[in-house]
UniProtKB/Swiss-Prot annotation:
<dbReference type="GO" id="GO:0005829">
    <property type="term" value="C:cytosol"/>
</dbReference>
<dbReference type="GO" id="GO:0008830">
    <property type="term" value="F:dTDP-4-dehydrorhamnose 3,5-epimerase activity"/>
</dbReference>
<dbReference type="InterPro" id="IPR014710">
    <property type="entry name" value="RmlC-like_jellyroll"/>
</dbReference>
<dbReference type="GO" id="GO:0000271">
    <property type="term" value="P:polysaccharide biosynthetic process"/>
</dbReference>
<dbReference type="InterPro" id="IPR000888">
    <property type="entry name" value="RmlC-like"/>
</dbReference>
<comment type="function">
    <text>Could catalyze a 3,5-epimerization.</text>
</comment>
<keyword id="KW-0413">Isomerase</keyword>
<dbReference type="Pfam" id="PF00908">
    <property type="entry name" value="dTDP_sugar_isom"/>
</dbReference>
<dbReference type="GO" id="GO:0019305">
    <property type="term" value="P:dTDP-rhamnose biosynthetic process"/>
</dbReference>
<feature type="active site" description="Proton acceptor">
    <location>
        <position position="76"/>
    </location>
</feature>
<comment type="similarity">
    <text>Belongs to the dTDP-4-dehydrorhamnose 3,5-epimerase family.</text>
</comment>
<protein>
    <recommendedName>
        <fullName>Protein RmlC homolog</fullName>
        <ecNumber>5.1.3.-</ecNumber>
    </recommendedName>
</protein>
<feature type="active site" description="Proton donor">
    <location>
        <position position="140"/>
    </location>
</feature>
<dbReference type="InterPro" id="IPR011051">
    <property type="entry name" value="RmlC_Cupin_sf"/>
</dbReference>
Length: 197
């Protein structure tokens, strides 16, 4: 859990390093039984800055990945927007890299995410995380349906690229897929044009 976990007011912050990347504080209510949160409620999120365009195509798919400590996933930019959060008592170190064409190409942001925080990640921004807790259930709500024919639209950057300056926890102990180990360095990534997003 982060330093302030329970009873934060619902709030949204724009991340200046990466336009469109939003960080949300999510109210978590706890007692002797555990805790409860509304992970996402459209009526409350839109007025504080959640993008209305997320719902334009009427497609929503919610995914949950389960990972163990030291697992590192990323960095992937899929052809959809996503709202990510942690669905249990776990904690991750999240990292994002702007792969969109423009002056913020290559900009990086990272923060720790637990159940009291959510992130809106616009398409074209690569997303990755490393598990800091014993396990974590990582939830991501996306605005398109997964389909194999969308794979060619994915973009990737290597999590260990020193030019990114990402500070991972104990990278030598990280459990990483072969695919993620072989993603290109930022210098070899072709910036994503608006028409490709």
């Amino acid at each position: 859990m982060t330093e302030t976990f329970f009873d934060k007011p619902l709030a949204c912050r724009e991340i200046k390093e990466i336009p469109g990347l939003l960080e949300f504080d999510i109210p978590v209510r706890g007692d002797n039984r555990g805790w409860f949160k509304e992970n996402f409620q459209k009526e409350k999120m839109l007025p504080i800055g959640f993008p209305e365009r997320f719902f334009e195509e009427g497609k929503l798919q919610n995914n949950v990945s389960f990972s163990r400590q030291h697992v590192l996933r990323g960095l992937h930019a899929e052809p959809w927007d996503k709202y990510i959060s942690v669905a249990d008592d776990g904690k991750v170190l999240g990292a994002w890299v702007d792969l969109r064409e423009g002056e913020t190409f290559g900009n990086v942001y990272q923060t720790v995410i637990d159940a009291s925080k959510g992130m809106f990640v616009p398409r074209g921004v690569a997303n990755g995380f490393q598990v800091l807790s014993e396990t974590v259930s990582y939830s991501y709500l996306v605005n398109d349906y997964w389909a194999l024919d969308l794979k060619p639209k994915y973009a990737f950057v290597n999590y260990a690229d020193p030019s990114l300056g990402i500070t991972w926890e104990n990278l030598a102990a990280a459990e990483v897929s072969e695919a993620d180990k072989n993603h290109p360095l930022l210098s070899d990534v072709k910036p994503l044009k608006p028409k490709d997003l």
